[in-house]
Amino acid sequence: MQHKYDIATAMRLYFIAGSQDVTHFASDPADNLLSVLEQALQAGITCYQFREKGKRALQNPIAYKALAIACRNLCRKYKVPFVVNDDVALAVEIGADGIHVGQTDMPPHQVKRLCTGKCFVGTSVNTIEQGLIAQNDPNVDYFGVGPIFPTQSKEDAEPVLSPAFITQIRANHIDKPMVAIGGIKVKDVAMLMAKGANGVAVISAITQSNHIEKTVKELLR
């Protein structure tokens, strides 16, 4: 199926966040997320993933869904793809553009079936074997590789890889759109793309920034 977004282009600067990532601000975390997301969208992020997970995430299902819808609406306003992490039922219900699943989440073929092909599907890759499986699975449209560097943003992060792993992925003829993730800073972007990544996914680089517009522009440089 043809998606309305070019996925390789969407991977250029992929922002991932939930309210748990913006609790360091003074006001309500849900409001904080919407503020940070809109600033990032205005500055030029190319994709956003709603990832509401962990001990500090919203626990109330009504508030959770309302926040997801508000994030989706912002993404639509700026014509940027809106991806939901793991929660396939939510993604289908609110009309997400994409769904991202980890290695222990629902298999991509089931995700594609449940969203009746209307969503693009991404998965997480931490080994060459997983990369080959993703490459050969017609239900996988892109994959995230990482963590490339140590990260504090994910409580359940896999073992740290290295930038060289991206080169190894491409050397194994794995050519689907690929985004690097995990502890990535502005200074790392050009090097990671030179090794074969289509772009970078970041959480704290944006959520911890004192000047979101400047940071996003630098990440896109």
Swiss-Prot record:
<dbReference type="GO" id="GO:0005737">
    <property type="term" value="C:cytoplasm"/>
</dbReference>
<dbReference type="GO" id="GO:0009229">
    <property type="term" value="P:thiamine diphosphate biosynthetic process"/>
</dbReference>
<keyword id="KW-0460">Magnesium</keyword>
<dbReference type="Pfam" id="PF02581">
    <property type="entry name" value="TMP-TENI"/>
</dbReference>
<dbReference type="InterPro" id="IPR036206">
    <property type="entry name" value="ThiamineP_synth_sf"/>
</dbReference>
<keyword id="KW-0808">Transferase</keyword>
<feature type="binding site">
    <location>
        <position position="86"/>
    </location>
    <ligand>
        <name>Mg(2+)</name>
    </ligand>
</feature>
<keyword id="KW-0784">Thiamine biosynthesis</keyword>
<dbReference type="InterPro" id="IPR022998">
    <property type="entry name" value="ThiamineP_synth_TenI"/>
</dbReference>
<dbReference type="InterPro" id="IPR034291">
    <property type="entry name" value="TMP_synthase"/>
</dbReference>
<feature type="binding site">
    <location>
        <position position="105"/>
    </location>
    <ligand>
        <name>Mg(2+)</name>
    </ligand>
</feature>
<feature type="binding site">
    <location>
        <position position="124"/>
    </location>
    <ligand>
        <name>4-amino-2-methyl-5-(diphosphooxymethyl)pyrimidine</name>
    </ligand>
</feature>
<keyword id="KW-0479">Metal-binding</keyword>
<dbReference type="InterPro" id="IPR013785">
    <property type="entry name" value="Aldolase_TIM"/>
</dbReference>
<feature type="binding site">
    <location>
        <begin position="49"/>
        <end position="53"/>
    </location>
    <ligand>
        <name>4-amino-2-methyl-5-(diphosphooxymethyl)pyrimidine</name>
    </ligand>
</feature>
<comment type="pathway">
    <text>Cofactor biosynthesis; thiamine diphosphate biosynthesis; thiamine phosphate from 4-amino-2-methyl-5-diphosphomethylpyrimidine and 4-methyl-5-(2-phosphoethyl)-thiazole: step 1/1.</text>
</comment>
<feature type="binding site">
    <location>
        <position position="183"/>
    </location>
    <ligand>
        <name>2-[(2R,5Z)-2-carboxy-4-methylthiazol-5(2H)-ylidene]ethyl phosphate</name>
    </ligand>
</feature>
<comment type="similarity">
    <text>Belongs to the thiamine-phosphate synthase family.</text>
</comment>
<feature type="binding site">
    <location>
        <position position="85"/>
    </location>
    <ligand>
        <name>4-amino-2-methyl-5-(diphosphooxymethyl)pyrimidine</name>
    </ligand>
</feature>
<feature type="binding site">
    <location>
        <begin position="203"/>
        <end position="204"/>
    </location>
    <ligand>
        <name>2-[(2R,5Z)-2-carboxy-4-methylthiazol-5(2H)-ylidene]ethyl phosphate</name>
    </ligand>
</feature>
<feature type="binding site">
    <location>
        <begin position="151"/>
        <end position="153"/>
    </location>
    <ligand>
        <name>2-[(2R,5Z)-2-carboxy-4-methylthiazol-5(2H)-ylidene]ethyl phosphate</name>
    </ligand>
</feature>
<dbReference type="GO" id="GO:0000287">
    <property type="term" value="F:magnesium ion binding"/>
</dbReference>
<feature type="binding site">
    <location>
        <position position="154"/>
    </location>
    <ligand>
        <name>4-amino-2-methyl-5-(diphosphooxymethyl)pyrimidine</name>
    </ligand>
</feature>
<dbReference type="GO" id="GO:0004789">
    <property type="term" value="F:thiamine-phosphate diphosphorylase activity"/>
</dbReference>
<comment type="function">
    <text>Condenses 4-methyl-5-(beta-hydroxyethyl)thiazole monophosphate (THZ-P) and 2-methyl-4-amino-5-hydroxymethyl pyrimidine pyrophosphate (HMP-PP) to form thiamine monophosphate (TMP).</text>
</comment>
<protein>
    <recommendedName>
        <fullName>Thiamine-phosphate synthase</fullName>
        <ecNumber>2.5.1.3</ecNumber>
    </recommendedName>
</protein>
<dbReference type="GO" id="GO:0009228">
    <property type="term" value="P:thiamine biosynthetic process"/>
</dbReference>
